[in-house]
A protein has these predicted regions:
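C-terminal capping/lid segments that line or modulate ligand- or cofactor-binding pockets
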Residues: 22-55, 339, 387-391, 445, ...
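Carboxylate/His-rich catalytic cores and anion/metal-binding grooves
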Residues: 78, 87, 291-299, 336-381
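Structural helix-adjacent loops and short alpha-helical linkers that scaffold large soluble proteins
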Residues: 288-295, 311-313, 346-356, 416-430, ...
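Alpha-helical scaffold segments in carbohydrate-active enzymes
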Residues: 300-307, 358-365, 431-442, 478, ...
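The feature captures the catalytic groove of carbohydrate-active enzymes
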Residues: 324-332, 378-425, 434-513, 707
């Protein structure tokens, strides 16, 4: 756990003596949604080939046949400084600042070389006005007149160290996924093209340099290329080097790419990017009175959701770690659809549509995946990357974590309900129908009409391979209901589409029967809901014997053993009830909390926020606030001791936002007008925010339990 980040209204700050603090590198990530860069210290002689972290959405390379990794690209945020012919050494702590209002990360420190002390500052941002631009400014001064040498360019030796899917295994073998194909050196620029292993993708990095210090010379070595400058720096004189890099790829579709000039100055590009950030914050900010640390942390969560969403590119989604790390090979999970979508849906509907269109685009791969599993229709893979094919290498998870195929139609319907986007709804209807076909072929339907869903896992991955997981079965029923309504709508209004999908009344009636007869597990004595058929047969255990802090228990308890204890990894039944609250009575929801909250290990970073949301929705304010604090500061305080090692947890960021909007603010959208029932966390005196609903923008203000809402 860490508590050394200083929180300010629009900034976070950290001072450290380390030049390679992976916690800082994760938390001080900055980006623009299309690309981003971890908060490592540049212009330092230490070369960390796989630990830097420059990522562009959708750029994956093949590490084995059919399996990809998120490419750690050759980074232009790199260089070194020499003074009087000697490398510099750190002589003060490194001070880092992340400005969330503008996306600029700043780092400053003192360095010594011989008798000279250098005061070094570095600023970097990824432009929000032109998502292909990465902009830097390096400046430093010397305590005495010194002979200075500066190298800047592209660290071409960057590589990947693929992280195994298994959370208790480690890998130390690296693989280079971006090979230089060609380069061109001009007076004030460097242009280098890289080919990505196995996927045929091309990445181009064009660097433009501006400094008045001296003329540049070309610099090429085995692991880098760029420019170098030599000259005398007078005592008190400041050397300023501005570097703008345009990063383009062979798969770009964002219309804003190339909209700014690479030759513009740092200040000119900063002004344009800041204007775009101002617009984005006007849609997304949550203003809180009375809780300054929470205010900063909420803005941090929002900032990091924005910086990992390529809002205008529907060929990509958001990985479990966004653009902040290669954990889980950068793949897209159900995290996006169930935990992140709501934030974008109510603050940036265009981005939400893009995320849903990614699932429409990959429907053919989902159909192929179902076919491989000897099923009909479409089964969405558990983990996907650039082409929508299955990337999960854990056979039990990949084969049995079926619920994603129902989660995606659920998310699509959420998008339609909030926007009324009829054109998208027509596309979504095909997804509803093809996924319903999968469920009908995957379930076991008995002669009496009853049905079971066998060999599955719900969100609680500690249940072993089980039968009739309640979360999955109820989401399947929701999916089937969507398909039934879609089929009727197509038959009446779009008969050609109905015919093209080979629909018939008999198939739709079969979905009716499955929806009505698929099993929901209950305790035969009490009638209370159960997570699945096997939960009560597992061995009870005092969870205090399994863990003593908020770190995951699987680091010291064998995973096989965890599968046989009566414990829950993360919200499962409670998650279902937060997503489909109308299906359950308040008594049923509170009974579920009483039954399952005490035995939850919270071994997933999804869990705290989901419990906060459920508790806030159901009047459990004290518990809601307890879990909300853990979720809100999960990364900023490294609550689970894995932020530095694995990157930021985007699903937690998204669900934390939902715990505010749907939990503490009590947002509901049953009719044409949004309704709220706010109960703010302790210390929050007032709250203000904007949101979208069905094409309208609204302003919400909450004060002392009252609220007002107005159209903007």
């Amino acid at each position: 756990m860490r508590q050394d980040i200083i929180l300010k209204p629009w900034q976070i700050e950290l001072t450290t003596n380390s030049t390679n603090d992976n916690f800082e590198e994760s938390t001080f990530f900055t980006g623009n949604g299309r690309m981003g860069i971890r908060g490592y210290l540049p212009f330092w002689q230490e070369k960390r080939t796989f630990e830097t972290g420059l990522f562009v959405a959708g750029i994956f390379g093949e590490i084995k046949p059919g399996i990809t990794d998120f490419v750690n690209l050759p980074t232009p945020v790199w260089g070194n400084i020499e003074c009087d012919g000697h490398p510099i050494t750190l002589s003060s702590p490194v001070s880092s600042t992340l400005d969330m209002k503008t996306g600029v990360r700043s780092q400053s420190f003192l360095a010594k070389s011989g008798e000279s002390t250098l005061n070094i500052e570095h600023h970097v941002f990824c432009s929000m006005s032109d998502p292909s631009l990465l902009v830097q400014r390096l400046s430093f001064s010397a305590s005495r007149t010194s002979n200075i040498s500066v190298h800047a360019g592209i660290h071409t030796a960057c590589c990947n160290c693929p992280v195994p899917d298994d959370q208790v295994k480690e890998n130390h073998e690296t693989i280079k996924l971006a090979e230089p194909a060609q380069h061109d050196m001009c007076k004030d620029s460097v242009d280098c093209t890289f080919s990505i292993l196995g996927t045929g993708l091309i990445v181009r990095e064009q660097m433009f340099f501006h400094t008045s210090f001296s003329d540049s010379e070309d610099y090429i070595s085995d692991d880098s290329l760029g420019k170098q400058w030599h000259g005398i720096l007078q005592s008190g004189q400041k050397l300023v080097l501005e570097i703008t890099t345009r990063i383009t790829t062979s798969r770009d579709i964002d219309p804003l790419i190339g909209s700014n000039e690479i030759s513009d100055t740092y200040d000119e590009l900063f002004a344009k990017s800041s204007l775009a950030w101002t617009s984005r914050w006007s849609e997304s900010d949550i203003e809180i009175d009375g809780a300054p640390d929470d205010q900063s942390a909420v803005r941090y969560n929002i900032f990091q959701l924005i910086t990992s969403c390529s809002a205008r590119d529907s060929s990509v989604s958001i990985g479990a770690r966004g653009l902040t790390h290669t954990r889980y090979k950068g793949c897209y999970f159900w995290d996006t659809d169930l935990f992140m979508l709501s934030f974008f849906l109510y603050t940036h509907p265009e981005a939400a549509k893009s995320l849903m269109e990614y699932r429409v685009r990959t429907l053919p791969q989902a159909k192929e995946n179902a076919k491989k599993m000897n099923n009909a229709g479409a089964r969405y893979p558990w983990m996907t990357s650039f082409d929508g094919s299955e990337q999960c290498e854990s056979w039990d998870i990949g084969a049995s974590e079926l619920h994603i195929t129902a989660d995606i139609p659920f998310a699509m319907q959420q998008y339609f309900d909030a926007t009324g986007d009829e054109n998208f709804h027509l596309q979504a209807m095909e997804v509803y129908i093809e996924t319903a076909r999968f469920w009908y072929s995957r379930c076991i339907i008995h002669p009496d009409g009853s049905a079971d869903l066998m060999f599955c896992k719900g969100p609680d991955e500690y249940c072993g391979i089980t039968n009739n997981n309640l979360f999955t079965n109820c989401m399947v029923k929701f999916n089937l209901d969507l398909a039934i309504k879609a089929a009727l709508r197509l038959r009446e209004a779009y008969p050609n589409r109905y015919s093209k999908l080979s629909l018939c009344d008999e198939e739709v009636l079969a979905w009716h029967s499955l929806r009505d007869n698929l099993k929901e597990c209950r305790d035969p004595q009490t009638g209370r809901y159960l997570p699945d058929e096997t939960f009560t047969r597992l061995e009870p255990v005092d969870i205090k014997t399994l863990k003593t802090d908020d770190g995951a228990s699987y680091h010291h308890v064998c995973f096989d053993r965890l599968q046989r204890y009566q414990v829950i990894k993360q919200a499962d039944t409670l998650l279902l009830m937060s997503r489909l609250p109308k299906k359950f009575t308040l008594e049923e929801r509170l009974n579920a909390w009483e039954d399952f909250e005490p035995c939850c290990l919270h071994d997933s970073t999804l869990s705290f926020a989901s419990h906060a949301l459920f508790a806030a929705q159901n009047g459990l304010q004290e518990a809601a606030e307890k879990y909300f604090k853990k979720a809100l500061y999960l990364d900023l305080h490294e609550i689970m001791n894995n932020t530095g090692k694995e990157g930021l947890h985007l699903a937690c960021l998204g669900e934390t936002w939902s715990s505010i909007f749907f939990g503490f603010l009590g947002a509901t959208f049953d009719g044409d007008t949004p309704v709220f029932s706010p109960v703010l966390p302790s210390g929050w005196k007032a709250l203000r925010m904007n949101f979208y609903w069905r094409g309208e923008s609204y302003r919400l203000m909450v004060f002392e339990g009252r609220y007002s809402i107005s159209r903007i």
